[in-house]
Swiss-Prot record:
<dbReference type="GO" id="GO:0005739">
    <property type="term" value="C:mitochondrion"/>
</dbReference>
<keyword id="KW-0469">Meiosis</keyword>
<comment type="similarity">
    <text>Belongs to the UPF0300 family.</text>
</comment>
<dbReference type="Pfam" id="PF08594">
    <property type="entry name" value="UPF0300"/>
</dbReference>
<comment type="function">
    <text>Has a role in meiosis.</text>
</comment>
<dbReference type="InterPro" id="IPR013903">
    <property type="entry name" value="Meiotic_expression"/>
</dbReference>
<dbReference type="GO" id="GO:0051321">
    <property type="term" value="P:meiotic cell cycle"/>
</dbReference>
<protein>
    <recommendedName>
        <fullName>Meiotically up-regulated gene 132 protein</fullName>
    </recommendedName>
</protein>
<keyword id="KW-0496">Mitochondrion</keyword>
């Protein structure tokens, strides 16, 4: 993929040299035969596109992604640093892996004139787009969407407050977490902090399952990189043998080529003045170091990556491969990017928030039952302790009786189970 000649310049770098026009001879010199980039020839001002409207004046084509390197084989790691990990990281032709993509969603995220664009389409060829592929611009009507989101928060503060508490305490299911992470750029700072807390809990759960390392958790606690990238399996990340400015996210039914903001380079994070210096020193493998380099290089383009489509292709989120929306998970989210003249136009989005709250409450209830099962503590014992605590504080017992009655079957089931396990242990000891 991307066999460049000469220095590696992106289309945004070249376009920035001339504010009014693009010199196509420069593209021919630096991107011979690999890229097809076209702008509208009409001199009239181009109308700003809507969120789900394709852009007709920008296009980009790419081919030859049949083989690439896993991210852990990042070739920019110097020899002195490689020696610290006691492992061979020199990339050879034997390290090239075949593209696992068979069919599904194929997309390219790229910069142009300080804007992020996403070209996407459904195909069964990892080297070409179908004719019905389209290019979309990310971040359309950013100020308007922030305003509408604040309007929704002010209209239903109780719902948002409860969702905020679930996110901050790490008690939100994955579908709710992904839904709000894809709206991250439009939320106020307090809600963004709550989303980071929820993602931190998600990453720590992945660490317990052996799917992530402590470095991923440390980086998440320091809020390094884009929040959406922590939802992607690090083993699905690759890079091109000819360019370190492109990241490849690939699975059997999803492929995304992401244009990085800066070139992936290890030396920049190992400078003592770098804010990533201490974190880079804690890396225990080249795989961790390569991932950290990628997170510090990706920039804002990760916001346009359809993470919900990636999780859907992995059968993690929901079974559909093709998402309903391009940049967002729910179809009602598109109402945030329109000129709202009446609060009734946001009722669909507000209804979706209420459903998110119900999902959080159900997840919290199921988590409580699982936690009691895992630590060997019956569920009914939680209610007894809660009743004693409220009684000592002078709280009436009415709040305790209702959940105890509604969970009688569950309590009896766990009580019988733990008594059975206790009898087995006592027999073995005797």
């Amino acid at each position: 993929m991307l066999s460049f000649g000469g220095s590696l310049l992106s289309h945004s770098d070249i376009a920035s040299r001339n504010k009014f026009s693009i010199d196509y001879s420069q593209f021919k010199a630096f991107f011979p035969g690999n890229w097809k980039f076209s702008n509208s020839k009409d001199k009239k001002p181009v109308r700003s596109p809507t969120l789900d409207e394709p852009v007709g004046d920008v296009d980009i084509d790419i081919f030859d992604v049949s083989k690439f390197y896993p991210l852990k084989r990042l070739s920019s790691i110097p020899e002195k640093i490689r020696a610290n990990y006691h492992e061979e990281l020199q990339t050879t032709s034997y390290d090239l892996v075949r593209n696992p993509f068979t069919h599904g969603l194929f997309c390219v995220v790229f910069y142009h004139q300080n804007k992020s664009y996403l070209k996407m389409g459904v195909t069964d060829n990892f080297n070409a787009f179908e004719e019905d592929s389209r290019v979309y611009q990310y971040g359309v009507n950013h100020k308007l969407s922030c305003k509408n989101l604040l309007l929704a928060i002010n209209y239903s503060p109780k719902t948002y407050t409860k969702i905020f508490d679930f996110l901050r305490n790490g008690r939100a299911p994955l579908q709710v977490l992904v839904h709000h992470c894809m709206l991250y750029n439009f939320y106020p700072e307090d809600f963004q902090d709550a989303l980071w807390c929820a993602v931190q809990a998600h990453v720590m759960n992945q660490v317990r399952l052996g799917r992530a390392t402590l470095l991923h958790a440390r980086a998440c606690y320091q809020k390094i990189g884009d929040i959406r990238m922590y939802l992607i399996d690090p083993h699905d990340l690759y890079f091109s043998p000819n360019s370190l400015k492109w990241l490849i996210i690939c699975s059997k039914q999803f492929q995304a080529l992401v244009h990085l903001e800066v070139k992936m380079d290890t030396l920049k994070i190992f400078r003592r003045r770098s804010k990533y210096f201490n974190l880079a020193r804690s890396c225990v493998s080249g795989f961790e170091l390569s991932w950290l380099i990628m997170m510090t290089s990706i920039g804002s383009n990760a916001s346009a990556v359809p993470v919900h489509a990636y999780l859907a292709s992995k059968r993690i989120l929901y079974p559909s491969i093709i998402p309903e929306e391009i940049f967002f998970m729910r179809k009602f989210d598109s109402s945030l990017f329109k000129d709202i003249k009446n609060i009734h136009e946001l009722l669909g989005f507000l209804g979706r928030l209420f459903m998110d709250l119900q999902d959080c409450e159900k997840f919290h209830h199921d988590y409580t039952e699982y936690h009691c099962y895992r630590i060997g503590k019956p569920l009914y014992q939680n209610y007894e302790e809660e009743a004693l605590r409220k009684k000592s504080q002078g709280v009436k017992d009415a709040d305790f009786i209702k959940p105890l009655v509604t969970n009688t079957r569950t309590a009896e089931k766990y009580k019988a189970f733990f008594e059975y396990k206790r009898n087995i242990v006592l027999k073995k000891q005797s």
